[in-house]
């Protein structure tokens, strides 16, 4: 068969789905991020560019020399992994270019909720929770971190200790009371940065 009518498999439908799983930033919103979050994204980008991508390129190059690419698992997996890495590199580059680093330590001692705050609050049922309000690219809900665009964060922003705010949930409107607001001390944001 003529080579013009065959094509090497270079894309998977699964690859496009990965972009849909990325944190969504509302249109026109700034990409706020803490210094620690910015460092983590920058370090990940550097590791991909300096370490992981060159290793995969070397593997793909070696595998390509081994003949029939259509049944060459090392080649096919390597190409797929290379696409994933390149997509992540593009994503990180865009996010870092748009990032606006916010120093939350300037609010240390303040009782008002701003970006970077750790907030302890109680629901109208008396349940207490503590969350930290971070950027969309750094928040991990399993660690009690929420994005500043999340409904709970939007409800709490600018509230002060003792304030009651309304939170719209699927179960209806809840009233939550701000019990405590904390920020990292000046020069101490590195202490709360995950490794």
Task: List PLM regions with ranges.
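Helix-rich terminal scaffold detector
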Residues: 1-51, 55-90, 185-195
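Conserved NTP-handling cores and scaffolds of large molecular machines
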Residues: 45, 49-52, 96-100, 160, ...
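Non-DNA-binding regulatory cores of transcription-related proteins
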Residues: 102-176, 182
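Hydrophobic residues in alpha-helical segments
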Residues: 64-67, 96, 156
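Structured, basic alpha/beta domains of bacterial-type, RNA-associated proteins
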Residues: 86-107, 175
